[in-house]
Regions:
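N-terminal, polar/charged subdomain of small-to-medium soluble alpha/beta proteins
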Residues: 1-107
Length: 107
């Protein structure tokens, strides 16, 4: 999976880049059909924000997290995306198991 990292008012150091890659590549354990991700790291006066847009088959997923520490924001972002990816995977697998109401109706 390709991960693009952009920084607003923050320099993306190699350590920060490696941390983002390590945390967000774990999402592939939950779902194999991840095509790409765009991560934006932003620093304002008192908060560090991490946002990510994840391209999956049949849609896109978005999550953001705010914290006083950038690494904590990345951790929270990873947790939010993991929940969204598992929910998306369950939607796709459960959708194919549905049967029509018409076939189950009693004549």
């Amino acid at each position: 999976m390709q991960i693009d990292i952009t920084g607003h008012h923050v320099d993306i150091t190699p350590a920060l880049r490696n941390y983002v890659h390590a945390k967000l590549e774990r999402l592939e354990r939950h779902f194999d059909h991840l095509t790409g991700m765009h991560v934006v790291l932003t620093v304002t006066k008192l908060e560090h924000r991490a946002e990510a847009t994840l391209q999956v088959n049949h849609g896109k997923l978005f999550a953001d997290a705010v914290d006083s520490d950038m690494y904590a924001a990345i951790d929270a972002l990873s947790d939010k995306l993991a929940r969204q990816v598992t929910k998306h995977k369950e939607k796709l697998t459960n959708h194919s198991d549905r049967t029509s109401v018409r076939t189950d109706a009693v004549p």
